[in-house]
Structure formats: structure tokens, C-alpha cells
Amino acid sequence: MELIEKHASFGGWQNVYRHYSQSLKCEMNVGVYLPPKAENEKLPVLYWLSGLTCNEQNFITKSGMQRYAAEHNIIVVAPDTSPRGSHVADADRYDLGQGAGFYLNATQAPWNEHYKMYDYIRNELPNLVMHHFPATARKSISGHSMGGLGALVLALRNPDEYASVSAFSPIVSPSQVPWGQQAFAAYLGENKDAWLDYDPVSLISQGQRVAEIMVDQGLSDDFYAEQLRTSNLEKICQEMNIKTLIRYHEGYDHSYYFVSSFIGEHIAYHANKLNMR
């Protein structure tokens, strides 16, 4: 991994690395925050998945998470949201193509050559992190919007691999809303059964489980009613007896002003779960 940025932050280092991804067949950037204790010991890892139009920079520059990661001794890994490059398929819209990988494995041309974000996040990136950084095998996952969707899907499909999962403003029923329907049709084809593998509410209804889900949702979020539908997740978790910590916040929108307001509580939540044995 090639170091391309290095910034001192809260006694640790906010770095950005570039590497070639075998899963995605392109160069990828990834933000890695190493707290002070990483100098002398191995630490657990929180993976953060960002939303539509984002890259590795949004979370590391806007959330203020470094303060809390340093306090709780957690390495934070923030990858890009899709494969990148002039040779990678793209679309002339913000919600499909580069910047909109949806954390799935595409099966349809032209997307299936590079868009394997599920494999990248689940397998390739953790292996790189374990090899290059002082990381233990303990990991949790979180994200925002499209990234919240990705975090929920990865945790629900691999409950033994993640100590905890949380999300800000996640797309919880992508097969039922425009963002998800458009992306899934392009990436996965018209067989809607294939879509359900990447739909958190559907996965839970089929019996997939995690111990607990934490979600924060702003009630002034312009996308809440049409695209996010947090109440669908709350309802299915109640029906399936999955413990939740779902909080609704008056006045908060879909932006990083919202994420930065509550990221400290999410990191504390994950720290507690990561330190349990």
C-alpha cells in the first residue's frame, strides 16, 4: 500500500493509502486512522462505508471521528464507494456507476468486470488491513445512507465476522425505493430475487440476524420518506425479535452535520462491543 497523505490528528495519524485491488481491478484509495496506541499494540477496526457521490475523503475530513477513535483506541478504515478509473464503467448520473457502487457484486455487463464492492469490503480490504497495520481480527462496521445499507447487508450476511453494526440514515429497503431499484436493475438485472440478497429488511425477514442494530435518522432528511424508510427496519426487527437502538432526531438532515453530531456515540457503541469477549 502506498502512503499518499499523512496528517497528525488527536495524537495519532490520519493517513490515506493507494493500492491495486484484485477484486475491483483498479487502483483504490482508502483512509486509515491510526490512534496513538497503534504505535505499541494491535487494535480493533471499525470499517466505515460512505454514501452516494462520496469517496474516502468525506468521512475522514467532515465527521470529526478521529477524536473519538483516539479516545476509544480503534483503527478506522474508510474506503472509497466504488471502483475508479477511466477504464471502469460509469454513468452520467450521481446514483449509478463511479461513486455509487452500492457495496454489492454486480452480475450484469458492463458493471460486473469491476463492481465487486461486496467482496472488496468483506474479504480483500480486511486482509490488507491485517497485513499492513497493527490490527486485531476484531472488527465492526458502520456507514451513512448507501453506506449504511452496505454495513447492514455485510453484518446481516456475515454476523460472525462483525462485533457490531450501526448506520446513519441507511437505505433499509432498497428493493422498494428508487435509488435501490435503479441500481439493482443495472448491477444485478431484472430478476428481483437477486436484489433481496442486498436488502436489509428482506434479509431479516428471511431469518438473517445480528445481536443488535444501532441507527440514527434525521427527521428533516429530504430522503427519509421516499428513499430511506427507517421505520421498515424498525418494524421487521420488532417482528423478528432483533434488538435495536433506533433514534430519530428532530431538525437533522442527511448531511455530515448530522453524522458529526452523533459519530462519537457510534464509536463508543462499537468500542464497547469490540472490547467484549
From Swiss-Prot:
Broad EC category: hydrolase
Pfam families: Esterase (PF00756)
Gene Ontology terms describing biological process: formaldehyde catabolic process
Keyword line: Hydrolase, Serine esterase
Any coiled-coil regions, as ranges: none
GO molecular-function terms, A-Z: carboxylic ester hydrolase activity; S-formylglutathione hydrolase activity
Any one annotated GO CC term: cytosol
Known catalytic reactions: S-formylglutathione + H2O = formate + glutathione + H(+)
Enzyme Commission number: 3.1.2.12
Keyword field contains Transcription: no
UniProt superkingdom: Bacteria
Active-site residues from the entry: 145 (charge relay system), 221 (charge relay system), 254 (charge relay system)
Keyword 4Fe-4S found: no
Role summary: Serine hydrolase involved in the detoxification of formaldehyde. Hydrolyzes S-formylglutathione to glutathione and formate.
Annotated family: Belongs to the esterase D family.
The name this protein goes by in its record: S-formylglutathione hydrolase FrmB
Gene source species: Escherichia coli O6:H1 (strain CFT073 / ATCC 700928 / UPEC)
Gene designation per UniProt: frmB
